[in-house]
């Protein structure tokens, strides 16, 4: 048990060191050698600091190749058989490329994948314009591990038609069941109307999917590639780009500085999906679920910046900020009204992160139950609340109530 825990923490340290080393190198985002330098730094850190360094050889190369292809197209929705044949020439060469900071393989996969995704985005709408005939029996292979890649673009389009038909059939069956239950309320829809609704739902979902994909930058794909390299050392070691490191810190500490709202993007609009209890927005009742943020300013005098065409992460960066500072949001309310809202940022705690205790009573005893949803710590300030100190407080609190015993529940997917 000690070795498992020790290995976990060493891996976590390596992950943070990789982030630190890379994030403290100064280079512009458009510098052509940036990615090569990242490969060089990551391989150096892993070789010198990892507790169990690996030999980067042909076996290592094969694993990186297989994992990367699986990571970018696990369901074989985009790449063609000819693409895989082209990529396979590098299957035994990735180790050499890592050692020489060469990224030819990544460049080839990235450019090819972008092209294939664009092709699918072009033809999926064409498929969904035509009603599906659910009276015609067809077969589709969903065993992705044993599924062959499409021979060509026409073959891929046929595969997509079957997959979309299956999705539409699933939606059709669900909607028809609801429809049949509403017969008494005279809300019955025809089968053709239900089929149209099913295709429309799929279209909306795919628009969101391709919108998200269009916002992915080269660095996002390169992070995937780097992580297929570092996870060969052990499953707990990972490369964190600066943006991912910020999210990691937020998740591991259970808090962040901002307005206290969760956002999502749909149809080029940034919408409030949740107001976080205890945050500035919640305390002053400033925003509601469904409100749309159209622009952001950092002062009352500043011209608001339109955010509809931004990546969601970039828009979020404009909205978040240090405790005590103000942000001015142009908001379209659910009722259609538009107004500018001033919000003073603060520290927002995610209550679902932290340890909590409760009492359970039966006829003879009172029991204490402590629930720890996840491990948490603030790496910037170890004096702040963390899982260990909070558990101690909860135990002492339960002891003061003279419970019969305490029991700690842990998430089953976390290592302890």
Where are these regions (language model features)?
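Terminal peptide-recognition signature
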Residues: 64, 225, 261, 281, ...
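Charged, amphipathic alpha-helical regulatory modules used
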Residues: 25-124
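Soluble non-cytosolic domains of exported or imported proteins
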Residues: 32-37, 54-59, 63, 103-107, ...
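Extended, domain-scale alpha-helical bundle/helix-rich regions
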Residues: 130-252, 256
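PDZ/PDZ-like domain segments forming the peptide/carboxylate-binding groove
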Residues: 54, 70-71, 92, 109-122, ...
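Cleft-lining beta-strand/loop regions that shape enzyme active-site pockets
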Residues: 23-26, 31, 48-56, 213-218, ...
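Single conserved hydrophobic/aromatic residue that forms the stacking wall/gate
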Residues: 407-416
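Hydrophobic membrane-insertion alpha-helices, especially the h-region
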Residues: 7-19
């Amino acid at each position: 048990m000690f070795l498992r825990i020790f290995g976990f923490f060493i891996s976590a340290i390596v992950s943070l060191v990789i982030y630190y080393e890379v994030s403290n190198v100064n280079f512009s985002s458009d510098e052509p050698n940036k990615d090569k330098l990242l490969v060089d730094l990551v391989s150096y850190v892993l070789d010198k600091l990892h507790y169990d360094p690996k030999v980067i050889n042909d076996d290592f190369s094969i694993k990186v190749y297989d994992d990367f292809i699986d990571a970018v197209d696990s369901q074989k929705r985009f790449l063609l058989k000819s693409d895989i044949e082209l990529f396979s020439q590098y299957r035994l060469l990735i180790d050499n490329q890592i050692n020489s900071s060469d990224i030819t393989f990544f460049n080839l996969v990235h450019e090819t994948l972008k092209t294939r995704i664009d092709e699918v985005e072009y033809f999926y709408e064409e498929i969904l314009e035509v009603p599906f005939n659910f009276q015609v029996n067809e077969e589709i292979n969903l065993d992705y591990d044993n599924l062959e890649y499409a021979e060509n673009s026409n073959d891929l389009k046929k595969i997509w038609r079957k997959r979309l038909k299956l999705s539409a059939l699933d939606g059709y069956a669900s909607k028809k069941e609801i429809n049949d239950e509403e017969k008494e309320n005279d809300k019955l829809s025809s089968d053709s109307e239900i089929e149209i609704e099913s295709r429309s739902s799929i279209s909306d979902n795919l628009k969101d999917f391709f919108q998200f994909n269009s916002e992915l930058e080269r660095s996002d794909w390169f992070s995937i590639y780097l992580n297929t390299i570092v996870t060969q050392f052990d499953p707990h070691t990972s490369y964190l780009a600066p943006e991912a490191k910020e999210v990691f810190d937020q998740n591991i500490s259970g808090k962040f500085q901002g307005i206290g709202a969760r956002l999502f993007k749909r149809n080029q609009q940034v919408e409030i999906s949740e107001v976080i209890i205890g945050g500035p927005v919640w305390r002053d009742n400033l925003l509601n679920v469904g409100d749309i943020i159209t622009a952001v300013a950092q002062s009352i005098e500043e011209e608001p910046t339109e955010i509809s065409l931004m990546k969601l992460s970039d828009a979020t960066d404009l909205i978040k900020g240090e405790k005590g500072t103000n942000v001015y949001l142009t908001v379209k309310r659910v009722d259609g009204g538009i107004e500018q809202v001033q919000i003073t940022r603060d520290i927002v705690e995610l209550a679902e992160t932290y340890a909590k205790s409760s009492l359970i009573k039966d006829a003879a005893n009172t029991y204490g139950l402590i629930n720890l949803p996840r491990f948490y710590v603030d790496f910037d300030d170890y004096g702040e609340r963390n899982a260990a100190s909070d558990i101690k407080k909860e135990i002492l609190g339960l002891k003061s109530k003279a419970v019969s015993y305490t029991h700690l529940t842990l998430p089953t997917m976390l290592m302890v």
